[in-house]
Regions:
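C-terminal/domain-edge helix-coil "capping" segments
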Residues: 17-30, 117-119, 123-182
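Short beta-strand->alpha-helix linker/helix-N-cap micro-motif
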Residues: 22-83
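Amphipathic beta-strand/beta-sheet edge segments enriched in Tyr/Trp
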Residues: 79-139
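Residue-level detector of Asp-centered blade-edge/turn motifs that repeat once per structural unit
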Residues: 154-155, 198-200, 243-244, 287-288, ...
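Hydrophobic beta-strand positions that form the internal "hydrophobic ladder"
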Residues: 159, 203-205, 248-249, 292-293, ...
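A flexible loop/linker signature enriched in serine peptidases of the S9 family
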Residues: 165-170, 207-215, 231-234, 251-260, ...
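Multi-bladed beta-propeller domains
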Residues: 176-192, 220-235, 263-279, 307-323, ...
Length: 420
């Protein structure tokens, strides 16, 4: 039997205790912000120290401020001291952690140094101490929303990962975007290709093997129950979910060769979209769910194509690169990973590109290394991806509109797939 080409490449895993952020591109002059820690009674000194680095990192990735290096100690209601003038901040972000043994609480306020006015203030709580990174993510996302800055709601979203544990076995992990928080939700057997089921991230689809046959399941995070969706010989993978959550784009291979199918969750029926003797995989909704972007080898090498949600004629979207095998969509935008030829004897290079289905627009997003698994954020303004550069692996975050890129160096391991 001819093997199905799985175009989601095996990538190194991401299990770092703390992420080190590197700003790749710098542009506009941003207002300076000083961080002050007003914590006086918190049970975990380790979490307190790591939280200070996390909130500074979140502000940096948010790309709206220049974060002044170093965290000052103060009390929550203390007036601004004259000593901060030397650092010339436009804002002071002051926070206080409390608890830490059971419920963890966070108070945070943003102070305008011109007149000492409080521009934003809020309280947060988290019952599970292990989820402490989300306190920082939520606060910084709320500040951006309150000040009408570029939206970063994705910061408070989770990433779902499949990680190989040994040959023939993979577990599924829920993590924050820095992968500082990790929670194993499925283990035992082969659990691969997780895909969020809805914008609330209350459930995800994944593929496993049931009696030797690839089977698609839905896992509910609240009830910890799984429900069977469908199965198919060869392979079955949920690559995208419609905006209303009622339909899935599946890659299935009932007759050995993979094609794209539209699966209706209400009627539990599948409609074939592509019918090709080679390989069609990784379908993604685009153009308000009216079309499908997918990867196919119909021109020889894997490349990016599009067709109507009802099937029919196929349009080639990309005309460069030797292997365009990883793709994600948002509205009418497509981000993909493209293998490019470098100098003789040089290491292979996969760069990320952004195109539009409505124009000839194309933008190169990365320049070096092996950059794969691009995934749009929920608002389309950011892209997460996996970056390999020599012996160093990292999670990359691209702020598309801000023209900034960040990398988080990580420890090694083997990652099967990722969804944001």
């Amino acid at each position: 039997m001819k093997k199905i080409l799985v175009l989601l490449v095996f990538i190194t895993s991401i299990f770092a205790a703390d992420a080190t952020i590197e700003v790749v591109n710098r542009g506009l002059v941003l207002p300076r912000i000083l961080i002050q820690d007003a914590t006086t009674n918190f049970a975990s000194s380790d979490v307190r120290e790591r939280f200070s680095r996390m909130i500074a990192g979140d502000l940096t990735v948010g790309s709206a401020f220049e974060v002044i290096e170093g965290i000052e100690k103060t009390t929550y209601d203390a007036p601004l001291g004259a000593e901060i003038a030397a650092k010339n901040p436009a804002f002071v972000l002051r926070y206080e952690l409390a608890g830490g043994s059971g419920e963890t609480m966070l108070k945070v306020k943003l102070i305008d140094t011109k007149d000492s006015s409080v521009r934003f203030e809020a309280n947060y709580s988290q019952s599970d101490l292990k989820r402490w990174p989300f306190l920082s993510h939520r606060a910084i996302a709320d500040i951006a929303r309150n000040l009408e800055l570029s939206p970063i709601e994705w910061m408070d979203k989770s990433i779902v990962i499949s990680q190989y544990t040994k040959p023939g076995e993979a577990r599924i992990i829920i993590a924050d975007y820095t992968l500082t928080y990790q929670n194993v939700v499925l283990s035992g057997g082969l659990n691969i290709f997780p895909k969020w089921a809805n914008v609330e991230q209350s459930a995800f689809y994944y593929t496993t093997h049931e009696k030797g046959k690839p089977t698609l399941y839905k896992y509910d995070l609240a009830t910890r129950q799984k429900s069977r969706i469908t199965s198919s010989g060869g392979m079955v993978v949920a690559s995208d979910v419609s905006k209303d959550g009622s339909k899935l784009l599946l890659t299935m291979a009932p007759a050995d060769q993979s094609d794209i199918f539209l699966y209706d969750l209400n009627t539990r029926s599948a409609k074939r979209i592509t019918s090709y003797s080679g390989i069609d995989v990784n379908g993604n909704f685009v153009d308000n769910d009216s079309r499908v972007v997918f990867v196919s080898d119909r021109m020889g090498n894997p490349n990016i194509f599009a067709t109507s949600i009802n099937g029919g004629g196929v349009e080639q979207l990309v005309y460069h690169g030797k292997n365009n095998s990883s793709v994600s969509t948002w509205e009418n935008y497509v981000v993909y990973s493209s293998r490019e030829s470098g100098e003789e004897y040089s290491q292979r290079t996969f760069n990320l590109y952004l195109i539009s289905t409505k124009s000839d627009y194309i933008r190169q997003l990365t320049a070096t290394g092996v950059n794969t698994f691009p995934r749009f954020s929920s608002d389309g303004g950011s892209i997460v991806y996996i970056k390999d550069a020599g012996s160093q692996s990292a999670v990359g975050i691209i702020r598309v509109n801000e023209n900034k890129s960040f990398s988080f160096p990580v420890n090694l391991g083997k990652l099967q797939s990722i969804d944001w």
